[in-house]
Amino acid sequence: MRVAGLFIYPVKSLRGCAVPAATVDALGFAGDRRFLVVDDAGKFLTQRTHARMALVDTRLAGDSLTLSADGAGAVTVSTKPDAAAPLRTVSIWKHEGLLAEDCGPAAAEWLSAFLGQSVHLVRIGPKFHRPVLKKAAHPGDLFAFNDGSPVLVVSEASLDALNDRIQENGGEPVPMNRFRPNLVLTGCAAFAEDAAPVLRLGDVVLRNAGKSDRCIVTTTDQLTGERLGKEPLRTLATFRRDPADPSSVYFGANFINESKSGTIRVGDAVDAHPA
């Protein structure tokens, strides 16, 4: 089993980028989901309700993050924490009262114009503290603006198995980017990521925190921002439900980085171990 791909998404729900190597830090993959778009009340926005977010490119260069979109120009902000930046109180899922740094009026105006409502861009600073709430979490396990865990793992074999079923039902195969993974595996059986208690990648250890439940974002074309019908959720519902939670469907696995430092590279060997 090896690493087939590595991806980071600098701003939650905006476009991500493939990287040849990912550095692990206290919150997961460095640079991943360290920024968040929020409304005036501090509530987070995602593609679930704002599919146009899929049209915004993100580019990291040095200490800068640039957002751009066709016909909308671009805006650049710093990735470095700023003690002088005003703080915003933000909420994401079960976490409320999180303190994040406001990235300033230029980013807010650019995103507000693009999304058609008043929004703000915030970034993680030294006052940010968000513990992982999964049962597998240990004291001190933290994460950024991810949904459920610091690292989302999917295997190529799992996607192939899903697409085989979709095509058997007359549908079109879906690409990996619909699932917005961080780590893509190759050389393993379908859904092997679900069953691996621990993944070891050189000096980096990842701990399994359970299967990832999927939402309407998986039906959104990540290049055009269009909703494209009911797949893959319709097919996932036929074979990827949990009897204990029949309202959800699952694809990919949530992992917590037990290691708070280290580097993972495309092509690295991956070993599955018992807990």
Q: Predicted regions: what is each one?
A:
Residues 1-275:
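Metal-cofactor-dependent catalytic cores
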